A protein has these predicted regions:
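Conserved alpha/beta catalytic core and glycan-binding cleft of carbohydrate-active enzymes
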Residues: 283, 288-479, 484, 492-496, ...
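Short, solvent-exposed loop/turn segments at secondary-structure junctions
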Residues: 3, 89-94, 133-135, 202, ...
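Short acidic (Asp/Glu) and glycine-rich catalytic loops that position anionic groups and cofactors
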Residues: 271-276, 336, 428-434, 494-502, ...
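Short, solvent-exposed loop/turn segments at the edges of secondary structure
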Residues: 80-82, 150-155, 219-220, 238-240, ...
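N-terminal structural segment of carbohydrate-active enzymes
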Residues: 1-171, 383-406, 422-425, 708-710, ...
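Beta-sheet entry/capping signal
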Residues: 82-83, 125-128, 192-194, 270-271, ...
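Carbohydrate-interacting/catalytic domains
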Residues: 1-85, 90, 107, 438-458, ...
């Protein structure tokens, strides 16, 4: 039990000067919050002015002494081993009955041993918390009895949001709230888990020009906010919130950097995810990757060694900038999200109605690490595939379970007549909108698919989860997706501070099976280095072992990584599918990877190869054929003692026979023996219905895949475990 000194006297700021009270740019005599102070009290920002004293009600700063005590050292998980888990402080544990009630939904609850054990057993290395800066909801939400649950309505950059602290800490004051936040970080670090904060530096809670004067606007409206034509009453909005902070102003850049250093040095967090990060890099002529703020992130001695992640867009002109941020920033990869959903859901929905989809080309590009987006840095290839924070879902949008249950958003509960939230979901309800009983069917079949809806939905969830975990890059899982959390079709639950948004821990049998599957897939990722590359694939042969044989590789169609070469008899134009340095369109063949003609005898196998359903290389036509829905990806062991990994997938609506490929025998080595370690057709990774003898196969063997399924094979060489993570 820590003893906290009584809070220091309040530290509000009084506006004074000739500006009239009604002016949109000031409030003479009013109280405003100091955005640079570390503590916050007051919870009635929108009450009418009290001519006697508004201080007891309005949010205002309190000076907080620097906290004492040493924090546990940062885990410093390498990017290649990183698994991000996006969570809301309240939503993660509010329904976790294994926690004492007073800890649920709090900073302390996130670091409770039960919550930590869940994260560790899942395989999470890094928790990314939705905003924890002090924030206030918008007036129109409060007027309708709602709140901004996500917290993207920042009041100040320093003080933590007190409502996420335990009641005891709130009653003890801002110093106790800060101690609880630091204690959370400390305990997570002791468990080997990093903490990233989602920070909102692009706008504030003060709304548009007719908004309230709570802090920044009352202090210096013209100096802090981006304006249209320099007129204080005409705000330029590139964030969709009514205002945007002006990162052309040194004072704004300084405020953001000071805040980041404070949270890193005093609170001990391991990094940040920057909301609408393009706004933070906007200069006089638009987004600039050499913007002073971004340069500071690269050079500041406190910040440059942290994990930094950009949300690479905003809603202003030229706002989509995925792949264009400088190192050391990683970026949310929306192209990965779209490609995974498109292949497994939207294209499958189209196919069920007899319409063509998009083929395998874009999916292959994302599985290979999205080099078309992240392989163009200066110097070239300095970022690598780990710069792609790949995800299928995030806090905004459908949950993983809802992606397979709804074709359309169901947001009426948000109070905006279902106008809010995106309509570009790329989802598929599998024939019936909304929840179904475990044995529900659509007339017994699904438009020609003789399967029940519920099992097929569950398989689609597993396909999406496996695509995320097996892809080159940094996977991000949204809290609860590993347990089938639903928001009942709401794809914009920002106002739902209730069971709609909170993670449910009361698991039905299928949700327990899904959790076991998620743990199994992340364990496979940890165990096999071929699934965790930190450099882009080249498609070229790896160096042979000192005593390894030289042999011929007869055109295995690997150029999906390098996108170079002319292609021999067996060469393909797979560079267009998953090219790296040159980008997807730059590839002309797989010759350098798989033989530039008969008689060429490289000394080793390539790091990446692609095959069709017959076990042969994909030709140019196949890469561009929307009807091709089956793909095999072979990643060879990066070091002796590691295992090769073969991923076999089909988006076809009927079962498919696939011939397993091989590379090592063609190179004069020992033929592969493939061991089946996972199949998305399995409800549980230890599926008792697995057929005897199906777990092992040789190259050339023909295996049967269920419709819309994915398999993972590995060579039997014992893998080396990645350090520092649970088995």
């Amino acid at each position: 039990n820590l003893h906290h000194p009584p809070p220091t006297p309040p530290h509000p700021l009084h506006i004074d000067g000739p500006v009239p009270f009604e002016s949109p740019t000031g409030l003479a005599g009013a109280l405003v919050d100091d955005p640079a102070i570390r503590g916050q009290v007051g919870d009635d920002p929108y009450g009418p002015p009290d001519p006697r004293d508004s201080l007891p009600f309005v949010p205002h700063a309190v000076v907080v002494a620097e906290p004492a005590g040493t924090l546990a050292p940062r885990p410093r998980v390498p990017w290649r081993d990183t698994v991000v888990y996006e969570a809301h402080v309240r939503g993660l544990t509010q329904r976790l009955e294994a926690l004492p009630e007073h800890l649920r939904g709090t900073y302390a609850g996130v670091a409770h041993p039960v919550a930590i054990e869940h994260l560790r057993s899942l395989g999470v290395t890094t928790v990314e918390l939705l905003p924890v800066h002090a924030n206030v909801p918008e007036p129109h939400l409060l007027a309708s009895g709602r709140t901004n649950y996500w917290g993207y309505s920042t009041l100040g950059f320093f003080a933590p949001h007190a409502a996420y602290a335990t009641r005891a800490a709130q009653d003890a004051g801002p110093a106790a709230v800060l101690d609880e936040v630091r204690g959370m970080v400390h305990l997570l670090h002791e468990a080997g888990i990093e903490v990233l904060l989602d920070v909102v530096h692009n706008h504030t809670c003060e709304g548009g020009a007719d908004g309230y004067h709570l802090s920044w606007r009352g202090l210096d409206n013209a100096g802090y906010y981006l304006h249209d034509g320099g007129t204080p009453a005409r705000l330029a909005d590139v964030t969709g919130t009514g205002n945007s902070l002006d990162f052309r102003r040194p004072a704004v850049v300084r405020a953001a950097l000071d805040s980041l250093r404070y949270w890193a040095e005093v609170v001990g967090v391991d990094g940040f995810r920057f909301d609408l990060a393009v706004t933070l890099g906007r200069g006089a002529t638009g987004f600039d990757p050499d913007h002073p703020f971004l340069v500071a992130l690269q050079t500041d001695p406190v910040l440059c060694g942290l994990k930094l992640v950009a949300e690479p867009w905003d809603v202003g002109p030229g706002g989509w900038r995925t792949g264009q941020f400088p190192p050391p920033l990683a970026e949310w990869n929306d192209r990965f999200r779209d490609a995974a959903r498109q292949f497994w859901l939207a294209d499958a929905r189209e196919a069920s109605h007899g319409r063509p989809g998009h083929g395998v080309r874009d999916l292959a590009t994302r599985l290979a690490g999205s080099a078309d987006l992240f392989g163009h840095s200066d110097p070239p290839l300095v970022r690598g595939p780990v710069a792609s924070v790949s995800y299928v879902t995030a806090h905004d949008g459908f949950t993983l379970a809802d992606l397979v249950a709804y074709d359309h958003k169901h947001n009426l509960a948000n109070g905006e007549n279902n106008r809010d939230g995106t309509d570009d979901n790329r989802s598929w309800n599998h024939g019936l909108e909304g929840p179904v009983t475990p044995d529900a069917t659509a007339g017994g079949v699904l438009d020609g698919l003789g399967v029940e809806i519920a099992p097929l939905r569950r398989r689609s969830i597993r396909n999406l989860l496996a695509t995320l975990v097996l892809a080159a890059g940094t996977p991000m899982i949204t809290a609860g997706d590993e347990m089938g959390r639903t928001q009942r079709g709401n794809n914009n639950a920002y106002v739902q501070d209730d069971e709609t948004s909170w993670v449910s821990w009361d698991l039905s049998p299928w949700r327990k099976d899904l959790l076991a599957t998620a743990r199994h897939l992340l364990a496979l990722r940890r165990e096999h280095a071929a699934l965790r590359p930190d450099a882009f694939f080249t498609g070229r042969p790896r160096p042979a072992a000192p005593d390894g044989p030289a042999g011929a590789v007869s055109g295995a169609g690997t150029g999906a990584a390098a996108g170079t070469g002319t292609g021999g008899e067996g060469g393909t134009e797979a560079g267009a599918a998953a090219g790296t340095a040159a980008g997807g369109e730059g590839g002309t063949g797989a010759g350098t990877a798989a033989g530039s003609g008969q008689g060429h005898r490289p000394t080793a196998v390539p790091d990446l190869a692609w095959f069709d359903a017959d076990g042969g290389p994909l030709d140019h036509g196949a890469w561009h054929d929307p009807g091709v829905r089956t793909l095999q990806m072979l990643r060879t062991a990066p070091e002796p003692g590691d295992a090769d990994v073969l991923v076999v997938l089909t988006g076809a609506l009927d079962p498919v026979d696939v011939t397993l490929p091989g590379l090592r025998a063609a190179a004069g080595g020992e033929p592969e023996r493939w061991e089946l370690v996972w199949d998305s057709d399995w409800e549980h990774p230890d599926d008792p219905d697995r057929a005897p003898g199906e777990s092992a196969a040789r190259p050339g063997a023909v295996v049967g895949l269920e419709a819309l399924s994915l398999r993972v094979y590995v060579s039997p060489t014992p893998p080396r475990e990645s350090p520092g993570r649970p088995r």
